């Protein structure tokens, strides 16, 4: 039996990344996980500025940045997906800008920022912002993922407990949680968990025991 997510409260479709909704979610979140390949745009835009403000808040707990370091079999092809009209050398500069931005956040906030380099092939951009989840998609297109379709999930409006997403990220989803909503959302969280890697993840779980 299929279930229409669009008939449920807590699910919105956006034609292009809804920056206003994203900023609103960041303002309210104390735990954030970003799995978006590169973050060069954040270096000088409102999202990056707000993240910097949140990191300075005493209530903020953790920002996990999954930073892509692509491998050769798909590196060039993925570059054309990220920036279709940009030469490969220019895309590499974006990667370098992204590395610098991430490293600077880690330097300024060593306890609050988990910076993770991953070589896992990204399947979609995923922004886990507290109790809201923003998911886009990559495509072989002349437009970027930011201009494509995005889905916004509000887990509270969907009837899940507060902090469900971040709890799944740290601890996984139990097999008992098998509702259609949980199964759908957990796939995106599992994608982030897989990109993180087992060794790093075990250290995060150990650290998290002292925070919750």
Segments (PLM) and residue ranges:
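Cysteine/selenocysteine-centered motifs that mediate thiol-based redox chemistry or coordinate metal-sulfur cofactors
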Residues: 160-212
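HKD-type phospholipase D/PLD-like phosphodiesterase module
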Residues: 70-124
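PLD-like (HKD) phosphodiesterase/transphosphatidyltransferase domain
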Residues: 1-79, 166-171
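HKD (HxKxxxxD) catalytic microenvironment of the phospholipase D
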Residues: 113-154
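Hydrophobic, Leu/Ile/Phe/Ala-enriched alpha-helical segments that form helix-helix packing faces
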Residues: 51-58, 98-109, 196
């Amino acid at each position: 039996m299929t279930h229409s997510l669009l008939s449920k409260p807590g699910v919105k479709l956006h034609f292009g990344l809804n920056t206003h909704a994203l900023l609103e979610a960041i303002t309210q979140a104390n735990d954030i996980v970003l799995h978006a390949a590169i973050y060069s745009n954040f270096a000088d835009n409102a999202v990056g500025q707000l993240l910097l403000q949140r990191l300075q808040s005493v209530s903020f707990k953790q920002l996990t940045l999954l930073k892509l370091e692509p491998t050769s079999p798909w590196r060039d092809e993925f570059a054309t997906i990220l920036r279709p009209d940009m030469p490969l050398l220019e895309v590499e500069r974006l990667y370098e800008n992204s590395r610098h931005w991430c490293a600077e956040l880690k330097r300024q906030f060593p306890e609050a920022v988990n910076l993770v380099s991953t070589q896992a092939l990204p399947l979609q951009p995923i922004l886990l912002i507290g109790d809201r989840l923003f998911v886009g998609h990559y495509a072989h297109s002349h437009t970027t993922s930011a201009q494509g379709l995005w889905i916004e999930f509000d887990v509270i409006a969907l009837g899940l407990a507060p902090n469900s997403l971040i709890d799944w990220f740290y601890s996984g989803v139990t097999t008992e949680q098998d509702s259609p909503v949980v199964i759908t959302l957990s796939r995106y969280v599992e994608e982030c968990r897989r990109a993180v890697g087992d060794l790093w993840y075990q250290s995060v779980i150990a650290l998290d025991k002292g925070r919750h």
